[in-house]
């Protein structure tokens, strides 16, 4: 009986002998270490969201440069059309031309600075951005001040008959009904031309407003990136403190 009991005890103890090992504790320690290593790597590594935000801001800047170049061309073209029509007093000051040229230079230099880099290109880009902002503001002020001034050759007496300038002894060649029809048709086309020129001036003012907004986009993107970077840094510090 005692021998059987001994063998029975040995048989009961043998299966339980390998159980009190340190495998579970060792695995738990490795998992904590792995978490710490992953947390450190994620703290040092640039997050995917930050890279995505950087790409988005870069695309916005490129779009603003393209918009500046296109709007600069439109400003020069519209200014040339209005100058041919002798329409605005601001054409004598050259507002559409120097505003458009500065905007085109700002966009082109921004592309060159992004491609080549360098301190000189960066300084030139900053100066042209400031110049584009100032010229857009000045052009808007000049254009809004001269919006209702019609300084062109289509005056109110352009459709009047030239018989008043003749001597009274000279007979009238054109009959009165035909002369009235001619004056009415002349006034109709003149009013259409005035509406067209006013529309062109409104388009030019809109181009300058868009140029003003486009010149402010780099500043807004810079401030937004600073705010985003600060928020991400604070989030990382809070995560490291919790770990």
Swiss-Prot record:
Keywords: Membrane, Phosphoprotein, Transmembrane, Transmembrane helix. The chain crosses the membrane at residues 65-85, 92-112, 122-142, 204-224. It is a multi-pass membrane protein. GO terms for biological process: negative regulation of dendritic cell differentiation. GO terms for cellular component: membrane. It is found in: Membrane. InterPro entries: CD20-like, TMEM176A/TMEM176B. The modification Phosphoserine is found at residue 42. It comes from the Eukaryota. Disulfide bonds: none annotated. Interacts with MCOLN2. Belongs to the TMEM176 family. This is Transmembrane protein 176A. It comes from Rattus norvegicus (Rat). The lineage of its organism: Eukaryota, Metazoa, Chordata, Craniata, Vertebrata. The gene is Tmem176a.
